[in-house]
């Protein structure tokens, strides 16, 4: 990892995690050290089952490692109350938006986080409306959540997290299953945000457009990757003007 002169938002120190009982445990993460600093935009990729989502769950206290420590602004987190403080400031956008949206209308879903932070109902409503407007979702307030498209649900789940004004974002496959238009909207929104973030994706082109540093998980360890750049190749072949696939 590169040197930083700012205090880390959160850090992992020697995190090891596995599934199962001690005598038959399947290791997923081993001795992971990592820190996220303000302004960092990190893309995280790796094969299915490599531990990417588990890493997010360890950061947020939804999974407790067998060893190691999570720190928030330099302070170790031990209790559920400690992790609650982190979750108020580190927004976790789940892979499946339906797991994050619970209320009949979009406005209720987006206002829920600010209400949980202690804002008065009117303040939470205003913040939700402002967040929806900032993300290009003005007019969605009274839409029924269950009738939204997959892409719209992803955007609303992001709005629900952004309404809490987080210091950092954890995004788990934010473009999974989206069409090109919805995917581009996510790219445009993320490109406009200064919020520190880690984004899990199998879509390398998406990561190249929205991240400036890259990590992968292999053999239970977190590894830095060399920067890559989005680019296109020209090509030609006979009958290239006919409909075809690559």
Give the ranges of each region predicted by the language model.
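Helix-to-loop junction immediately C-terminal to a conserved catalytic motif
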Residues: 60
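The feature captures the beta-strand-to-loop junction immediately N-terminal to the Walker
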Residues: 45-47
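H-loop/switch region of ABC-family ATPase nucleotide-binding domains
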Residues: 201-202
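Conserved ABC ATPase signature
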Residues: 144-148, 152
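Conserved ABC ATPase "signature" region
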Residues: 122-140
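Catalytic Walker B motif of ABC-type/P-loop ATPase nucleotide-binding domains
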Residues: 169-172
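Conserved ABC transporter NBD signature motif
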Residues: 68-78, 86
């Amino acid at each position: 990892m590169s040197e930083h002169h700012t205090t880390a938002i959160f850090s992992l120190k020697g995190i090891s995690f596995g599934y199962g009982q001690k005598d038959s445990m399947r290791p997923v993460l081993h001795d992971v050290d990592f820190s996220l600093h303000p302004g960092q935009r990190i893309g995280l990729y790796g094969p299915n089952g490599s531990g990417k989502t588990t890493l997010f769950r360890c950061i947020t206290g939804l999974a407790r490692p067998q060893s190691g420590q999570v720190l928030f602004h330099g302070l170790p987190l031990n209790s559920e109350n400690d992790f609650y403080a982190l979750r108020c400031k580190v927004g976790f956008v789940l892979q499946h938006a339906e797991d994050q949206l619970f209320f009949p209308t979009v406005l209720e879903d987006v206002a829920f986080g600010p209400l949980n932070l202690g804002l008065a109902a009117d303040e939470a409503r205003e913040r939700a409306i402002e967040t929806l407007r900032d993300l290009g979702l003005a007019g969605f307030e009274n839409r029924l959540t269950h009738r939204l498209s997959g892409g719209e649900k992803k955007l609303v789940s992001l709005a629900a997290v952004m309404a809490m004004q987080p210091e950092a974002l954890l995004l788990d496959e934010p473009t999974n299953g989206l069409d090109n238009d919805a995917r581009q909207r996510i790219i445009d929104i993320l490109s406009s945000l200064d919020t520190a973030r880690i984004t899990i994706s199998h879509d390398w082109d998406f990561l190249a457009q929205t991240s400036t540093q890259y990590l992968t998980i292999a053999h239970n360890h977190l590894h830095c990757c060399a920067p890559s750049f989005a680019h296109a190749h020209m090509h030609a072949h006979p009958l290239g003007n006919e409909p075809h696939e690559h």
